[in-house]
């Protein structure tokens, strides 16, 4: 079974939010809801001012704190290694939201449940890739099997030295970043 991950080359991100819109469309989210965020980071001072855009999403942690604190087992890891939420057993207690050190979950107030990025698992199981990956005009994201040394994602990580956010937390994220 593959161990899926995403590598993000934030040096290519132009902050267009195509990933966010594709995610919203794929997941039926409202315009004020998203599983993808773009953090804007200012660098330098005028006149040598620059802006870095950092795409953020659930890190699909192998040691997921959100999963450990879920009292109903609604947060679980799929056979593909994707951290998911079962909407039928989620009671909306928000323990998982508090436990996530990356703050990458949202509450669906209408349904009273917590939601998060699912790596578009329905597309992946049909041989596709997540919507945020396919829609990006600058190919910021690379999706693939982290355990396959010949995969594009593994090659990218090896060649660029891409790292997860906050490896010191011990969550073992499956999202890797190349930053400037």
What are the language-model segments listed below?
Residues 1-180:
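Non-ligating segments of multi-cofactor redox enzymes
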């Amino acid at each position: 079974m593959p161990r899926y991950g995403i590598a993000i080359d934030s040096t290519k991100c132009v902050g267009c939010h195509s990933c966010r819109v594709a995610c919203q469309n794929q997941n039926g989210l409202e315009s004020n809801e998203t599983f993808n965020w773009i953090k804007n980071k200012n660098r330098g001072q005028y006149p040598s001012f620059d802006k870095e855009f950092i795409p953020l999403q659930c890190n699909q942690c192998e040691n997921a704190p959100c999963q450990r604190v879920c009292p109903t087992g609604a947060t679980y890891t799929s056979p593909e290694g994707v951290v998911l939420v079962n909407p039928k057993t989620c009671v909306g207690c928000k323990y998982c939201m508090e436990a996530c050190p990356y703050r990458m979950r949202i509450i669906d107030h209408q349904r009273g449940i917590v939601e998060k990025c699912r790596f578009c698992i329905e597309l992946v199981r049909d041989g596709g890739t997540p919507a945020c990956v396919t829609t990006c005009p600058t190919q910021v994201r690379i999706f693939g099997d982290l355990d396959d040394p010949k995969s594009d994602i593994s090659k990218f990580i090896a060649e660029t030295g891409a790292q997860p956010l906050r490896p010191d937390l011990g969550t073992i994220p499956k999202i890797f970043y190349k930053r400037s």
